[in-house]
């Protein structure tokens, strides 16, 4: 036998009946008993949607147990009822005074002692009316143990209570306070209760989740829960390495709808939380998660947070991530989603992350973030220009953050460095390894595009810089170092054009751009006014954009040109002073460097050439060159203050001659005599 949505293998009806025709139709009365075997719902499993929609949630074991119990109860069962029915014309009524359902699975349901169900037809508006006076109980076979008590209300409709024992399944437990409800004559049933839930989550569980519940069941069976805000509390929650302690918040229906609804469209509804604030641990480290607003949908199992802020680790120097938008979804694998407008900082590291966007996931106790970001200097004014990464990947697992990415110059896309970061949330210690495979400076990429500190110091660079560095941090202490090198670079420096610059630079404070003493730069040529070649400069980079020149040496015109020790300040646009010492300059060789073909000279010079370099270029201020008299020792000067030069009239210093062509017709006698004198001048 099959009728509507219910089928049975065998149905028996016994009893007595009376029938008599009347002017309005047929009067009939039946008193009897009905029994049916193997009752089952026809068509698809009506609870299949419940199983799928709760998968991975704390109530999943309860939903599975309930669905399995209903399925098992439908395989081998028997239903019995005693009833009486009366029909007068087109109206009728029936009263069921005893009914029970039993299954081989152990499931039982039935009317309580002295209870009855009354049916009448047609009710106002058509259809079938019903009323229960007494109780209905369920138990066994995996079904919840429950008792429903109803009574007719004087004004119509029903009122009653539902008592349900705590329902458990594989680590899940649902407890309901007595459900109080009332049903109107139109078929709408309203109810109130409170739930307390314990249940498993991936790698953890929720414990003591409590929520007052108010809802209704429509005439078509649609269930609606909590159309208004209600206080949600929980004792603890653990999801992988994410854990919360005691938490309280107001849970409101999203967009004015119900918090939860279940009907022909399946499980729907959504929640909204204003001013979210959660405190707990992530990966064993302290965690605070806050947001201006949070929303979640039960239908799509998605959620989003607006202006979310995540703090991890030591509250005094936490890992900080702030996202204007964080969206995600939950599935059997865990959580995943997208983020945008994200900013962040790790502890006290003077590096800031901004404009980050990409994808994130949380599964198997591992948080992973992949996307793009901009890295800037936390110092003001900034020491380096912003860099971008389009392949940044961050992972948090077991209280350890690891991150990798390529840092690019944003305008040209040139690779500046590859970074590899490790940070321990528990201790607050970590390090960032920087690998600079080779930054090639061209007309498109210049040093000032990477750091403003290069402005006014170097320009028109052509060459490659490569090296490695490391930044380390622990508590409030940040240290860094690195070694970088270049070979055969050309550039325009503050003291003139430079070609063939080569050397290695060892930083003792990479972030502060401080080097070890006695760094060596080899220079093929430099031209502060006169070109000199094959120089060696020893120097040290100091804090606050200071450069200490320890020495500079060049072979120069048969002698030696030395740059005296000095400290130059590049922190501001102001004149910079250097002093070059000349020892043993050969006059003839020097004239050759000036390309003066018609001049010949002999002699040796010593001296000191103080120079000032500013926006006008370089110039000598107060310099001294002394023609060394033959037979005298070199004059080695450190300054020109109170300088006194002695001269022995008996000793010569050198000769100067004009060796160019002269036209006798144009000069005349006295002109010829003058140029004859210029052909061999002695000086001292």
Question: Positions of the model-derived regions?
Answer:
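Short edge-strand/loop segments of extracellular domains
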Residues: 627-633
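Short, solvent-exposed loop/turn segments enriched in Ser/Thr/Gly
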Residues: 604-606
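Acidic/polar loop patches that form or flank catalytic/metal-binding clefts of enzymes
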Residues: 550, 618-622
């Amino acid at each position: 036998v099959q009728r509507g949505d219910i089928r049975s293998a065998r149905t028996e009806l016994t009893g007595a009946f009376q029938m008599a025709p009347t002017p309005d139709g047929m009067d009939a009365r039946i008193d009897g008993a009905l029994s049916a075997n193997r009752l089952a719902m026809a068509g698809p499993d009506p609870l299949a949607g419940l199983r799928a929609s709760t998968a991975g949630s704390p109530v999943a074991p309860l939903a599975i147990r309930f669905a399995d119990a209903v399925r098992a109860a439908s395989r081998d069962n028997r239903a019995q009822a005693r009833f009486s029915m009366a029909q007068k014309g087109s109206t009728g009524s029936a009263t069921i005074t005893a009914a029970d359902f039993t299954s081989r699975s152990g499931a039982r349901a039935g009317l309580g002692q002295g209870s009855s169900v009354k049916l009448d037809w047609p009710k106002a508006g058509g259809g079938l009316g019903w009323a229960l006076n007494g109780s209905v109980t369920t138990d066994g076979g995996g079904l919840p143990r429950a008792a429903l008590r109803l009574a007719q209300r004087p004004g119509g409709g029903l009122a009653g209570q539902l008592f349900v024992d705590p329902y458990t399944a594989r680590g899940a437990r649902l407890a309901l306070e007595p459900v109080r409800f009332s049903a109107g004559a139109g078929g709408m049933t309203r109810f109130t209760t409170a739930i307390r839930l314990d249940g498993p989550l991936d790698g953890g569980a929720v414990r003591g989740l409590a929520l007052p519940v108010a809802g209704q069941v429509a005439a078509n069976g649609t269930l609606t829960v909590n159309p208004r805000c209600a206080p949600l509390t929980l004792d603890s929650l653990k999801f992988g390495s994410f854990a919360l302690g005691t938490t309280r918040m107001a849970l409101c229906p999203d967009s004015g709808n119900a918090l939860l609804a279940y009907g022909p469209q399946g499980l729907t509804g959504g929640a909204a939380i204003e001013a979210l604030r959660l405190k707990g641990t992530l990966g064993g480290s302290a965690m605070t998660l806050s947001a201006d607003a949070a929303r979640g949908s039960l239908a799509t199992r998605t959620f989003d947070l607006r202006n979310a802020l995540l703090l991890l680790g030591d509250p005094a120097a936490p890992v900080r991530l702030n996202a204007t938008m964080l969206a995600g979804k939950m599935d059997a694998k865990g959580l995943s989603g997208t983020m945008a407008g994200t900013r962040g900082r790790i502890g006290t590291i003077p590096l800031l992350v901004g404009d980050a966007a990409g994808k994130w996931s949380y599964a198997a106790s591992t948080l992973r973030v992949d996307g793009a970001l901009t890295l800037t200097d936390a110092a003001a004014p900034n020491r380096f220009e912003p860099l971008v990464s389009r392949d940044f990947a961050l992972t948090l697992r077991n209280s350890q953050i690891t991150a990798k990415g390529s840092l690019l110059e944003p305008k040209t896309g040139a690779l500046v460095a590859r970074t590899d970061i490790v940070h321990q949330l528990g201790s607050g210690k970590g390090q960032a390894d920087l690998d600079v495979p080779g930054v090639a400076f061209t007309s498109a990429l210049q040093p000032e595009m990477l750091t403003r500190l290069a402005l006014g110091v170097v320009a028109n660079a052509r060459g490659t810089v490569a090296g490695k560095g490391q930044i380390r941090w622990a508590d409030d202490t940040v240290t860094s170092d690195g070694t970088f090198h270049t070979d055969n670079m050309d550039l325009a420096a503050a003291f003139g054009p430079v070609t063939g610059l080569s050397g290695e630079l060892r930083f003792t404070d990479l972030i502060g751009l401080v080097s070890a003493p006695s760094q060596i730069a080899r220079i093929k040529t430099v031209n502060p006014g006169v070109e000199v070649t094959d120089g060696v400069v020893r120097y040290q980079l100091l804090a606050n954009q200071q450069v200490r020149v320890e020495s500079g040496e060049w072979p120069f015109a048969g002698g030696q040109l030395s740059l005296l020790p000095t400290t130059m300040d590049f922190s501001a646009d102001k004149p910079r002073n250097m002093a070059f010492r000349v020892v043993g300059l050969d006059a003839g060789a020097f004239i050759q460097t000036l390309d003066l073909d018609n001049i010949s000279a002999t002699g040796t010079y010593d001296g000191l050439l103080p120079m000032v370099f500013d926006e006008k270029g370089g110039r000598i201020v107060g310099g001294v060159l002394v023609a060394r008299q033959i037979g005298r020792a070199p004059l080695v000067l450190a300054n020109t203050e109170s300088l006194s030069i002695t001269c022995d009239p008996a000793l010569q210093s050198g000769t100067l001659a004009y060796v160019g062509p002269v036209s006798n017709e144009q000069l005349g006698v006295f002109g010829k005599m003058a140029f004859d004198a210029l052909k061999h001048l002695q000086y001292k």
